């Protein structure tokens, strides 16, 4: 996320330290929920790195982790998904996440600003892990678009990573 709250995967180049943070996050989870746009962006990148590793450990490890994790994809336009361990879901996002949270297993990750905003009200997100990049974009997809009520949060962790990225963990209070 940019300093002004926008998400744009093309604007950020993750370094080894940032990807290692993502690797740690993915190790604690067994499911990720995607919208169509984020799913297609990830599907077009990471499976190829599994086949042809870059030689950069954190990148290659992340490719394997995201390739192996269970991927739940929400879309009104996709007819099928082909990436390994992916499942297309057409039922209500909130209902599906409530169902997933009731199952045993590890953490559930949410990928994509639209889904994060939708799941923030009602409070279906247990923890926000934000990575703020030192750039002001001025436009793009806002992380918390269409939030109609304030959400009080408590900071549980902060850390400055390489390249000036700040990791912020918050829980709703």
Where are these regions (language model features)?
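Enzymes that bind and transform nitrogen-containing heteroaromatic metabolites
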Residues: 1-173
């Amino acid at each position: 996320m940019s300093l002004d709250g926008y998400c744009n995967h093309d604007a950020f180049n993750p370094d080894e330290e940032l990807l290692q943070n993502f690797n740690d996050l993915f190790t604690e989870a067994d499911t990720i929920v995607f919208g169509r746009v984020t799913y297609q962006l990830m599907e077009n990148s990471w499976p190829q790195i599994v086949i042809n590793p870059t030689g950069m450990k954190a990148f290659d490890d992340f490719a394997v982790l995201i390739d192996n994790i269970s991927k739940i994809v929400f879309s009104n336009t996709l007819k099928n998904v082909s990436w390994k361990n992916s499942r297309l879901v057409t039922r209500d996002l909130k209902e599906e996440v409530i169902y997933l949270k009731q199952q045993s297993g590890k953490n559930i990750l949410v990928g994509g600003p639209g889904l994060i905003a939708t799941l923030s009200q009602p409070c279906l997100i247990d923890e926000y892990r934000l990575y703020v990049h030192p750039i002001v974009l001025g436009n793009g997809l806002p992380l918390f678009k269409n939030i109609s009520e304030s959400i009080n949060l408590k900071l549980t962790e902060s850390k400055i990573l390489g390249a000036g990225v700040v990791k912020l963990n918050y829980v709703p209070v």
